[in-house]
Amino acid sequence: MPLLWLRGFLLASCWIIVRSSPTPGSEGHSAAPDCPSCALATLPKDVPNSQPEMVEAVKKHILNMLHLKKRPDVTQPVPKAALLNAIRKLHVGKVGENGYVEIEDDIGRRAEMNELMEQTSEIITFAESGTARKTLHFEISQEGSDLSVVERAEIWLFLKVPKANRTRSKVTIRLFQQQKHLQGSLDAGEEAEEVGLKGEKSEMLISEKVVDARKSTWHIFPVSSCIQRLLDQGKSSLDIRIACEQCQETGASLVLLGKKKRKEEEGEGKKRDGEGGAGGDEEKEQSHRPFLMLQARQSEDHPHRRRRRGLECDGKVNICCKKQFYVSFKDIGWNDWIIAPSGYHANYCEGECPSHIAGTSGSSLSFHSTVINHYRMRGHSPFANLKSCCVPTKLRPMSMLYYDDGQNIIKKDIQNMIVEECGCS
């Protein structure tokens, strides 16, 4: 009984929300200042004289977002030379060779970087000893199982050099990937060596570096293409052989594993005579243990990608999509007070939202929309007659450089100005 009462309460609450929310088109064109995408979608597109109406809707929206009642009256514009000089000095824009100003859209670039960072995972894997001497084994974490695009991959090795080394200043360190069989063709410019190991394995040179042998320090070896091949083959294990022919001559040595770990694997349970005070050295060597640093992300077409890209209207689809619409400030006579950019991408959303599209992952606007659609599809009152709408699901900011009524140059960053993607509410 309490469950039925709770269900009835939720339905009543949702009914109140729906009744109190304005329906599309109930306010005529008054929605233009706050939602240009909604206003443009309601205007007729197939009427020859509809273009001016769409431009007027865009004008009202821009003025509203800049908190202006009307366009500034620029009676005596600042001389072009003075304007360009001020822009260069203040670093608010970039002046091209043709004299046009390109505004530096910092917020847009920052938003793109933040989105990319959110989609990128960083995994650090410490080395274990390999099956043979001077070999390392890396087992990439299961966290990376869904990652298929390598942004960066590096192996970090510590070169330990004695203080008395004076014989050689440089040594060459090479990294070879060990495989049972070389699969697929090698990328252009890569070098490969096939060396028989028990008649089964082969080796491929994946990184090489000439390093300074006069001081103890970390050295970084890029292995992005190697890890990319590994992920493409659906593998997570990497076996590496380290070669440094000149290291013995200089007395330098690569710390491939800490002493404690090496002793365990070689079965040396007892300490040798004279090693009683070596605990500090062992701990220090453990801190120099090799590791693999991997930065990777999911591919664009991954089935479990966090967010699907919205559709672009191309005339071939009639479901919810983004329609491109560009307004040039020069064409509408606004380039006298708007310095940059040269126009506005007034994209809008249009198309149908059938029941199998509305409320699905990637097209749903919110959890509330999904719940409403769940009841609507099952014919539950009061949602049976409600229809899904094609609305913006992702917007991006826009920077503008313009004159105000006092001939002052203003730079303003406006949030949620350009429609990037559309979906069904």
Curated annotation (Swiss-Prot):
Dimeric, linked by one or more disulfide bonds. Inhibin A is a dimer of alpha/INHA and beta-A/INHBA. Activin A is a homodimer of beta-A/INHBA. Activin AB is a dimer of beta-A/INHBA and beta-B/INHBB. Interacts with FST and FSTL3; these interactions prevent activin A interaction to its type II receptor. Activin A interacts with ACVR2A. Activin A interacts with BMPR2. Inhibin A interacts with ACVR1; this interaction creates a non-signaling complex (NSC) that inhibits ACVR1-mediated BMP signaling. Inhibin A interacts with ACVR2A. Residues 1-20 form the signal peptide. PANTHER family: INHIBIN BETA A CHAIN, TGF-BETA FAMILY. It is found in: Secreted. Residues 260-289 are annotated as: Disordered. Residues 21-309 form a propeptide. Glycans are attached at N165. SUPFAM superfamilies: Cystine-knot cytokines. Keywords: Cleavage on pair of basic residues, Disulfide bond, Glycoprotein, Growth factor, Hormone, Secreted, Signal. Residues 263-275 have a biased composition (Basic and acidic residues). The gene is INHBA. Inhibins/activins are involved in regulating a number of diverse functions such as hypothalamic and pituitary hormone secretion, gonadal hormone secretion, germ cell development and maturation, erythroid differentiation, insulin secretion, nerve cell survival, embryonic axial development or bone growth, depending on their subunit composition. Belongs to the TGF-beta family. One of its GO terms (cellular component) is activin A complex. One of its GO terms (biological process) is negative regulation of cell population proliferation. InterPro entries: Cystine-knot_cytokine (IPR029034), Inhibin_betaA (IPR000491), TGF-b_C (IPR001839), TGF-b_propeptide (IPR001111), TGF-beta-rel (IPR015615), TGFb_CS (IPR017948). Its main location: secreted. One of its GO terms (molecular function) is hormone activity. This is Inhibin beta A chain. Disulfide bonds join C313-C321, C320-C390, C349-C422, C353-C424.
